[in-house]
Amino acid sequence: MADDKNVYEIGLAMAGAISAGAYSAGVVDFLFQALHEWELAKRDEPDTVPNHSVCIRAAAGASAGSITAALAAVAVAGGLRPQKAANPEVGEQPYQCVLPALYKAWVTLPDMASAATDPKDLLANDDLKDGASPQSILNAAILTALTGEALGLPDLPNGAETPPAFGGAPLPYLAKRLHIYLTLSNMRGVPYFVGFEGGGEIRGHHMMCHGDRAHYILEGVGTHGGENTWLSGDSGQSLKITTAPRAGKPSDKAWEGYGHTALASAAFPVGLAARSIETDVGQYETRKWPRLSETAKSYPPRWPEKLKESKKFAFMSLDGGLIDNEPFEYARRAIMRDGEKDETGESTVKGAVVMIDPFPEPPAFSLKEVQEASIFDVVRALFPMLKNQARFKPDALATAFDNSNYSRWMISPSRTVAGTHGEKNERYAIATGVLGGFGGFLDESFRAHDYQLGRRNCQKFLRDVFSVGEDHPYVRDWPPGVADKFHNYDKEAKKFYHPVIPLVGTAALPVPAPQWPRIDQSRLAEIERRIRLRATYVVPRLIASKNRHKLLSVAAGRAWSWYGKDKLLKVVHRTIESDLIRRDQLDSEKSFSVEAREVLAELNAPGYDYRTVAGLDEVLYLNKTQVEKALEELEQIPNLLWSGEVNSQKCWALKVRVPGWLERHDPFRGEPRIG
């Protein structure tokens, strides 16, 4: 057996993803299946598999990543409970999931428009008491019930081994103290002070930190000790895993707070309700900052005297991903070893950060060189500018250009399909990416697809990517002949590489590619009906709660009923439908090329009356030739497109979208919108 020196440490980092958390959950689900199967093989056939150990020491999450990290840690401590896949082929992966609580939390429950007679979903209207002001567009109350249900561990099946949450043996692939970091966007802020010498009354610089986090330590989950000084000295709340909630039984306040904090990290602004957090000022006094330097200092805040006396600190939290959406620095700091050089080479590395990111795409970068900006241009750019700057991490640039760094790995969506020259990667890999991540709540099939894609991508990552060099000490200590069984040959480097986590048992059976999901027009119509009901319920209450003048309130209500509601719902319809068309997630009798779908989606989208080739070229990743060919393809469909000259420009539009004669000659309408 490998000794304590042959332990490879892992820090998981899970990026924010809204409904695409289903993908991250699938990745984590398969990761624990692979670790479990490997441990069984080490126990039963020790001479046939790699004998080093892996220790997951920390999991850091933002937004949806926080929910996945928090729920998965408890679920795995309650024991793997494999669920059979529907009609698996011979030789294929037999399981749909091994952590059903995670599957239920991300796939089954969080729907926008449930088919149930008495729906409890994100568009239900039971979250507002009479006269109360709406806290969010969607009904976030369902998420509270969902998290509570997912955290509650069901009784053990007959004959199952006793897991750590039920007093059984700790897991050999987790740390004794599993650290969970959840990022928060603190609406109140935490005050800090930097002293300067000078002659003024205030000798220093005051700052307010809104990028907050919660730190939980789950005790008794795994077997591995040896955490570093930074981690052991960082303030946090300890929870014994044997006190984890049980299904159908009330949980204590500490565990309720654990689930509530995970939800607070995922409180997407406006869409989902902000969450209240109450903690102790002492949590900030010994807090460590996750910088890469070896310094383990704390920087206490400059609290007002009143707060120092009360010791309690309460604030409202928004989505942690607003400020820190990829919290890999916490995972990185957690696995650094005291007194040792941070080795990153293929044959010297002793641990790694594994980041799971469903949306790794870069922020939009404008190719336009503008010389002036209107007030509206400034307002439109302000939020993305502040968000991107808040997420910028200069410390990470220090190692950004080190291509030989084997201590940073990423799992992100990849979906291959058959092409004319072999397999090709689809532009849209995940089904929950509709509407920037909210669209996964439109239908369970979207989330189910991404959960399985996460499992499939994780399997490929462990098999083909996550590795060390052939001269690594762990590999040299493997039993005779094992390295010949578990390896990949890199033709370019002319080297063998060996897996950090080998695939054995059921984990070696391939996870099949899930079928790409689509919804039909009837399902879309039902979703839009529910959106109308939700809007009819929420908007008048929002108007009434923020308008103290009765006459203004009545006028605003009339404007909404007579004009605003239909206008808004038309925009919502076209926005949803366009994104579904673009991503090939709406059933259609016609099959279009990728380029034609992109153009068709833009023609259908709200915002313009008429489109030009130049305008389409500007907003799409296509060039002008591709746009023109796509328009030619669409023009082959009878009664689909209109084309003609408008204001001396060659324009296109969907025939059903072309303004009628009355609309075109409306004196209050203004110039047609062309782009």
Model-derived regions, located:
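Patatin-like phospholipase
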Residues: 1-596, 609
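Hydrophobic residues on short alpha-helical segments
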Residues: 596-604, 628
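Short helix-capping/hinge SLiMs at alpha-helix to coil transitions
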Residues: 603-608, 633
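Short acidic, hydrophobic short linear motifs in intrinsically disordered regions
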Residues: 608-619
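Short amphipathic alpha-helical interaction segments
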Residues: 622-633
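Charged low-complexity interaction tracts in eukaryotic proteins
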Residues: 633-672
